[in-house]
A protein has these predicted regions:
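Conserved beta-strand termini and adjacent loop/short-helix elements that scaffold enzyme active sites
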Residues: 20-21, 68-72, 116-120
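Terminal domain-start leader segments
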Residues: 1-47, 78, 82-88, 109, ...
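A short coil-to-beta-strand element that immediately follows conserved catalytic motifs
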Residues: 17, 179-182
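Short, structured coil segments at secondary-structure junctions
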Residues: 42, 61-64, 110-112
Length: 182
């Protein structure tokens, strides 16, 4: 399901869609934990644009989204253009503090959309937590505390920081954390 707050942002910005690049915003809006990905959201659909290394993971983590392999399209901008043309998107917001100029220029040339800087609007949305996000944060804190209490006994002379880091990572997983770092 498309993030309701993103839909509200599209309406308030008076745009047809938004192009996200920051990994933390892509993850927040999509749930995707991989890297090197972009998210193009309209009011009706969300497209996770990624490369072949992540398409399988994306399909599992974001089953409600359309996964687009940008390498098959030739470029990120071309993949975005295919989507914007398909959905008749004319007004596209983008993360102006994250999209490099070259990609911005390519988006302008390829999509034919009028581009609007999103500023920190998505970051600000992400800062205000829902009850579900608060519950997840509480559980993460509980997991971290339990792992920390387990590692205290391992801290002694002769034990390296690398060993402690490896043990702490293991304890975190045993206590219920994701095994994948992000």
């Amino acid at each position: 399901m498309l993030n309701v707050r993103i839909k509200g942002l599209l309406k308030s910005m008076e745009v047809d869609a938004i192009f996200l690049k920051k990994w933390e915003n892509v993850r927040w809006a999509s749930g995707f934990r991989g890297a090197d990905s972009y998210l193009l959201c309209s009011n009706e659909q969300a497209f996770l644009i990624t490369d072949p290394r992540y398409t399988e993971q994306a399909a599992v983590e974001c089953p409600e989204m359309t996964i687009v392999n940008w390498k098959q399209r030739g470029s990120i901008a071309r993949a975005a253009a295919d989507i914007t043309n398909e959905l008749n998107i004319r007004r596209l917001a983008f993360e102006d503090d994250a999209v490099p100029y070259r990609l911005y220029a390519d988006l302008c040339a390829e999509t034919g959309c009028e581009l609007f800087p999103a500023g920190n609007n998505v970051d600000r949305l992400r800062m205000v937590k829902t009850q579900e996000e608060i519950d997840c944060l509480s559980e993460a804190c509980a997991i971290a505390c339990r792992a920390f209490y387990r590692i205290i006994d391992d801290i002694r002379p002769g034990v390296t920081e690398k060993e402690l880091a490896a043990r702490l990572s293991t304890y975190m997983v045993f206590e219920g954390a994701d095994s994948q770092q992000s």
